Amino acid sequence: MTEIISPHSINLDFLEKIFRNKLEIVVDPELETNVAKSYEIVQKSAEGDLPVYGVNTGFGKLANKIIPSEDREQLQKNLVLSHCAGIGEPLPEDVTRLMMVLKIVSLSLGASGVKWSTIKQIERIINSGIVPEIPHQGSVGASGDLAPLAHMAAVMIGEGFAFYNGEKLSGFEALKKAGIEPITLGPKEGLALLNGTQFSTACALASLLDAWRSVLNSIVISSLSTDAIMGSTSPLLPQIHELRGHKGQIFVASKMRELMDGSVIRESHRENDQRVQDPYCIRCQPQVLGASLDILKNASVTIDIETKAVTDNPLVLVDENKIVSGGNFHAEPIGFAADQIALALAEIGSISQRRIALMVDPTLSYDLPPFLTDDAGLNSGFMIAEVTSAALMSENKHLANPCVTDSTPTSANQEDHVSMSAHGAYRLFKMNKNLNSIFGIELLCAAQGVESRQPLKTSPLLQNAVDELRKHVPRLNEDRFVANDINNVSNLLDKKNILKSSKLDLPISTFFNL
């Protein structure tokens, strides 16, 4: 199936489908007319005598240097090659494809002055399976993500490096094997390809999609943990959350009620329970997860807008027949969104770790065995798994420090305030991975705890989650190499097995309905 790419029809659900699957794409042909008009304006300006940034001038601090007409084709190639200064591990292939799709979307809005064939070159590269090698370090998020996007543009002209059928090749060799001719860049085209926030936006969007999955996983796992320690469901009463009014909080409480409905464990201690109130990590789950969900929703609105934005400079105003300089390349909105996502991930992991600690502590777990193991002493059970969760939680807290406030001047002070969006968005991959491992440990503990309550049973939906877990990881009856268990469960969470079994696999568009 071929997916049509148009800025007028994409949304986060569509982009998730593009991100999760290697789909063939085609740029909406109806966009070609406006793109052609934009390119024509640039061509005319290139033939004139007035200086136009990026068309007949140098770049950055060198913008006052006028470039002779005979050197302007070389100017664009030089721009791409000189800006291929990124280092570090390459961007994951699925995120690279997402970045290229976002670049297509931005260019196809017809305000960047590129040829239609240049946009189609990106389309051809995506559909061929070529993945440009994009080093993840080198962008400060203004003027756009210059270095990462330069590495993408380099492959388009037969330079740089790319992966094709699992093999790392030169850009030229990758194109040759795929039957694609390198293109020659016209006036402004190199600048249009490099200027933009698509690296930062792709990283932030991919991380947002994973963060949404994490919130849903957390709702399921925290509900199971609540049952494991025989926590009260009274704090989930709808009246409590409606009195406060936060949409995320109301949503989380509602889903937890649905998941825990029918739990025999819960009914067994509804009356005559001497505990008046549960610890905050149980009682305040809707408040903490709900606040995290709300801040992710804020980030999703920003990212959704940015996926359909023109973040080039200068911009071509087709209706006014002119080219203007601006600052849409500054990725401050994405920098803020990335910091918001980081805060949410850190907090979700923090409260998850406290639930793990609660379940393994026999003085707090309401008669669960020490460290959730039989014959404690001979067996250590989940003792060190809990320590691992604490280490991951602490790392995520450190990674959650804001990046957007860490501006530094670059390019001889011409670009004197930057967003640091690229680093802010890229670190989210590590945070999501850490969080998934914390959840893996909590799910192992919660399932073990619920099973320790037998013959009492948890709710049907939560039992489905436990049953799905046990298809892949057996109960810990005696000590074994537990790292494998954690990795296996993290993989299940990645694949949404637990969400599907508990009927909570909801699309990210649910955000906008809260």
Where on the chain are the PLM-derived regions?
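A broadly conserved amphipathic alpha-helix scaffold signal in soluble, globular proteins
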Residues: 120-127, 147-154, 216
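Glycine-rich, flexible loop motifs
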Residues: 2-42, 46-49, 76-135, 226, ...
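Conserved, non-catalytic sequence blocks in retroelement Pol enzymes and Pol-derived host proteins
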Residues: 111, 140-142, 377
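C-terminal auxiliary extensions adjacent to catalytic cores
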Residues: 2-23, 27-34, 38-46, 72, ...
